[in-house]
């Protein structure tokens, strides 16, 4: 696949994201407008829950209503209070989110508690399922660090009903890496759930070349046909400009950011 082809595919798999603490209505509207490119639209935009209605209105105004709206809960710290995570998830759905990215209680898992993570995901999944909302579970691979913990968090999230497993919040020192992606993709393969569980690489994927490496990895482990927006996403913001530069034959400017 040519770099241009990869860029076009990657664009269609993006969850175009703004999760900065200084986010405003204007910035969310601008994000939605950025995603309306001559090469197509991203799979979703990802914003804080309170901005979901703003994004909905902006997407409708530019006639790109096919773009899903994702949001985050139990974010970014992945606390182990199940009630709070469920309450936040219910609120996100009430705001009108199509997809919820919930943070797995990874610190509890690191301390040896597997049950709370399973139960938290299970209860959030029940709430999402009742409303036809997709649940992505952020396991925070850069904090889990070890292959054993990354695999265990992936397994627990999947067994509890995750529709996607996602690498990172983008709020810690180490976000998506090819190593952690490989473990997560292999877990999806090994549990025989590729038809119903997807993968999202978030934070740290900034260039077309980097995106292409993740696409190639997913295809190697789960097959060419698996890589589509129902199964694979990139959580990113600065990646978009680099994909567009590739598609427009311009020299990419690496932009800092998620």
Swiss-Prot record:
SMART domains (alphabetical): DeoC
Keywords annotated in UniProt: Cytoplasm, Lyase, Schiff base
UniProt-recorded name of the protein: Deoxyribose-phosphate aldolase
GO BP terms, alphabetized: 2-deoxyribose 1-phosphate catabolic process; carbohydrate catabolic process; deoxyribonucleotide catabolic process
Alphabetized InterPro entries for the sequence: Aldolase_TIM, DeoC, DeoC/FbaB/LacD_aldolase, DeoC_typeII
UniProt source species: Haemophilus ducreyi (strain 35000HP / ATCC 700724)
Main localization, broad class: cytoplasm
GO molecular function: deoxyribose-phosphate aldolase activity
Family designation: Belongs to the DeoC/FbaB aldolase family. DeoC type 2 subfamily.
Compartment list: Cytoplasm
Pathway in which this enzyme or protein is active: Carbohydrate degradation; 2-deoxy-D-ribose 1-phosphate degradation; D-glyceraldehyde 3-phosphate and acetaldehyde from 2-deoxy-alpha-D-ribose 1-phosphate: step 2/2
Function field: Catalyzes a reversible aldol reaction between acetaldehyde and D-glyceraldehyde 3-phosphate to generate 2-deoxy-D-ribose 5-phosphate.
Active site feature: 101, 166, 200
GO CC list: cytoplasm
Coiled coil regions in record: none
Catalytic reaction list: 2-deoxy-D-ribose 5-phosphate = D-glyceraldehyde 3-phosphate + acetaldehyde
């Amino acid at each position: 696949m040519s770099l241009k082809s990869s860029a076009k595919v990657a664009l269609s798999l993006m969850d175009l994201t703004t999760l900065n603490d200084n986010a405003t209505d204007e910035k969310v509207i601008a994000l939605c407008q950025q995603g309306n490119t001559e090469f197509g639209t991203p799979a979703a935009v990802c914003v804080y829950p309170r901005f979901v209605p703003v994004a909905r209105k902006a997407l409708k105004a530019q006639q790109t209503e096919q773009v899903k709206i994702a949001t985050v809960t139990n974010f970014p710290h992945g606390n182990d209070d199940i009630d709070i995570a469920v309450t936040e998830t219910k609120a996100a759905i009430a705001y009108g989110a199509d997809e919820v990215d919930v943070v797995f209680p990874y610190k509890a898992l690191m301390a040896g508690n597997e049950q709370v993570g399973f139960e938290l995901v299970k209860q959030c999944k029940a709430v999402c399922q009742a409303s036809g909302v997709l649940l992505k579970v952020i396991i925070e691979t850069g904090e889990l660090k070890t292959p054993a913990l990354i695999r265990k968090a992936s397994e627990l999230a999947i067994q509890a009903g995750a529709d996607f497993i996602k690498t990172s919040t983008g709020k810690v020192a180490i976000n998506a890496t090819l190593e952690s992606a490989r473990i997560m993709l292999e877990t999806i393969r090994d549990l025989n759930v590729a038809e119903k569980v997807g993968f999202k690489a978030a934070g740290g994927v900034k260039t077309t070349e980097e995106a292409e490496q993740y696409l190639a990895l997913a295809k190697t482990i789960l097959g060419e046909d698996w890589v589509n927006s129902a199964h694979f996403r990139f959580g990113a913001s600065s990646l978009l400009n680099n994909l567009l530069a590739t598609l427009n034959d311009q020299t990419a400017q690496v932009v800092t950011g998620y």
